[in-house]
Amino acid sequence: MKLTCVMIVAVLFLTTWTFVTADDSRYGLKNLFPKARHEMKNPEASKLNKRDGCSSGGTFCGIHPGLCCSEFCFLWCITFID
């Protein structure tokens, strides 16, 4: 009986937590389209073209190539010189 009550309380808590922390998506598409249109007019305004958080050559990256500016990662960022 106690285990059942604990499980019910846990499920209610997790369900409430999910709804409280969820983003408000009522106006999500309304705000998304003007930004996308602005980026189409000015491609340099796109956030995808920016590499602010990338690491230079010789920096430890683990196995995540997205962390390196050169996109080549084998434990350390690899930069090729032409």
Swiss-Prot record:
Tissues where this protein is expressed = Expressed by the venom duct.
Q: Give the signal peptide as a residue range, or say none if absent.
A: 1-22
| Domain of life assignment | Eukaryota
Q: Which cysteines are joined by disulfide bonds?
A: C54-C69, C61-C73, C68-C77
Q: What is its main location?
A: secreted
Residues bearing 4-hydroxyproline? P65
Q: Name one Pfam family in it.
A: Conotoxin
Q: Which GO MF term does the entry hold, naming one?
A: sodium channel inhibitor activity
Q: Tell me a GO cellular component.
A: extracellular region
**Location(s), subcellular:** Secreted
Which PROSITE patterns has this protein been placed in? DELTA_CONOTOXIN
Does Signal show up as a keyword for this record?
yes
Q: Which residues cross the membrane?
A: none
Instruction: Name the propeptide positions.
Output: 23-51
Sorted alphabetically, the keyword list is: Cleavage on pair of basic residues, Disulfide bond, Hydroxylation, Ion channel impairing toxin, Knottin, Neurotoxin, Presynaptic neurotoxin, Secreted, Signal, Toxin, Voltage-gated sodium channel impairing toxin
Family assignment from sequence similarity: Belongs to the conotoxin O1 superfamily.
Record's function text: Delta-conotoxins bind to site 6 of voltage-gated sodium channels (Nav) and inhibit the inactivation process. Impairs rapid channel inactivation of Nav1.4/SCN4A (Kd=500 nM). Interacts with a conserved hydrophobic triad (YFV) in the domain-4 voltage sensor of sodium channels. In vivo, injection of both native or synthetic peptide induces twitching of back limbs, running in circles, and spastic paralysis.
The record's domain comment reads: The presence of a 'disulfide through disulfide knot' structurally defines this protein as a knottin. The cysteine framework is VI/VII (C-C-CC-C-C).
| Protein name per UniProt | Delta-conotoxin SVIE
Q: Record the organism.
A: Conus striatus (Striated cone)
